[in-house]
Amino acid sequence: ILGNQDEAGVAQLSDMGAREFARELAAYCRAYNLDGVAFDDEYSNSPDLSNPWLARPSAYAGSRLMYECKAVMPEKIVSLYNLGNMYSSSLQVIDGIEPGQYCDYAVADYGGAAGPGTGMTLKQCAGMSIELRRGSGNSSESTARSRKEAGYGYYMFFALDPSLYSSQVYRCQSVCKGLYDETLIYPSYYYKKNSTQREAIN
């Protein structure tokens, strides 16, 4: 969930706005059986502070939205991509509830590792954020193994590009070996966008 070049940014809703938006998100998550929501504070315009749904951009506003989401859908994942006003390290205690109770996972921006906020552990943090299209982020087996041994809970891959298929699979295989000591099997088929038809990989 991220901005859309308008005023309704994820870290600039009022308490009321956060509460109502959380209810709407919960309805979508349940209707479409989604795992949950992930917030990314970017691509938002400055808010009109005369609008009661909006507030000044802040870590508090972002924390409030995550808290409200967890309150209204405790069975769903509420996670965070560290950017803008929303970083795991700057999440705030809301109504006596620590971030570790309303933020399930946190992931850093390109090529980094997330740090735990108040009440969080490294297990709730991604040890690496790997952007496959640009090739950013360390995907070596040794780094994956060391991050796992340090206590990080997961890795994040994003921005897959079919035109770079072979190199992207290789990077995933390397990380898999470091995290699980297993070999990721090279796929033999794929699906084109919006298709349910298997296509053989040549």
Q: Which residue stretches match the model-derived regions?
A:
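Secreted glycan hydrolases and related glycan-binding modules that recognize and/or cleave
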Residues: 1-202
